[in-house]
A protein has these predicted regions:
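Alpha-helical membrane-protein architecture signal
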Residues: 3-11, 96, 100, 104, ...
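Helix-loop-helix units of permease transmembrane domains in multi-pass membrane transporters
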Residues: 76-109
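Aromatic- and glycine-rich beta-strand/loop motifs that create alpha-glucan
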Residues: 1-24
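Secretory targeting signals
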Residues: 28-75, 104-167
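Hydrophobic core positions of alpha-helical segments in small-molecule transporters
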Residues: 22-26, 100-101
Length: 167
């Protein structure tokens, strides 16, 4: 059994399992909780989505989001050992390929959960407030991925920031 079969099986198992979808929603909700009182004010943080997102990922509530990222597929080793699926898979293939496949899918699922949860959060705040305010855009222009803000590629900015957090 080659590595591609292990990966296909693990990815299929990930997609058919509901915890990844709960994890995505959990990441978005934990970002809402991270805003604390700012989530319930009229303009949220400075009246724009980028400042609100920046505050949400900078506060301590974001630590809960990492738990939701691990929630989606990190229990796979325990489940495989409990139901004796690990023994069956290793006997059919190779221990090294089995472990590498599981590790790749666990890592990938946590990154995907963080990215999609962050995009869900930003989409929900974007319904209420604009992307930026005129005078407050300079802070993001000097920071990481500032060229994306200058080109008004806000979704790409959020995607790359969430990808970096998920890694």
């Amino acid at each position: 059994m080659n590595r591609a079969h292990y990966l296909k099986t693990d990815i299929r198992r990930l997609i058919k399992n509901y915890p990844i979808y709960l994890g995505i929603v959990g990441v978005a909700i934990s970002m809402w909780f991270s805003l604390e009182d700012s989530a319930f004010t009229e303009g949220m943080v400075n009246g724009n989505a980028l400042d609100t997102y920046d505050l949400a990922v900078g506060m301590s509530g974001i630590m809960i989001a990492y738990v939701f990222c691990a929630f989606s597929y990190a229990t796979v080793f325990c489940e495989d050992l409990e139901y004796k699926y690990a023994r069956y898979s290793i006997n059919r293939g190779n221990t090294w390929k089995y472990v590498v496949s599981k590790a790749v899918v666990v890592y990938g699922s946590s990154v995907i959960t963080m990215v999609l949860g962050s995009l869900l959060f930003v989409a929900s705040i974007r319904l209420k407030i604009p992307w930026t305010s005129e005078g407050l855009q300079d802070i993001f222009m000097e920071g990481m991925y500032g060229s994306l803000i200058a080109g008004e590629h806000y979704w790409s900015y959020v995607f790359l920031c969430a990808l970096q957090m998920g890694m």
